Amino acid sequence: KADYVQEVPISLDAPETAPVLCRVSIVKSGHDLNNSIHRPERCLPAQGHFNLTGTKVEVPVEGHGIIRMTKLKSQQNITPDQPQPIILDSMHYYVFIGHRHMTEDHLARTLTDMKDRVLYGVDQRWCYFQISTAYGDKIKVPEEEARKQTERLISQLLSQLVKWDELDR
């Protein structure tokens, strides 16, 4: 895991800036399907996130066109021991990258993995790539600015990290 901070303007009318903190997670799966990676819809509630809503989005990647990702929105009480809760809004983008495949869909990943193991003897060794970003009035980061910054970082990182010539897209 890594944290990435870059200053971005809050508004066109105000000269001040605020950091947009993007948390980057890259997890590689093992050979054992039973102990392999899963999706954040399972992990985030265990970390205190609630009100999860998900959509499929298209994100441009520098020099490689558009990729589909799952985008989740969630809320988290960051003061659980206090009588007055402070609720933080977050967005989470994720995608699974295999030996020859990329998908934003957990079920598609599972079916591809089973088919490739049975028919071709290929273990995809999936990589799970996720970027999470907090936003909202409480931290003075508008949702649209957080989205732009997050998608820009996705583009920058995936354009360098993925072996694009090996993917069947």
Description of each model-found segment:
Residues 1-119:
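Short, solvent-exposed recognition patches
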Residues 114-169:
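Long, compositionally biased interface segments
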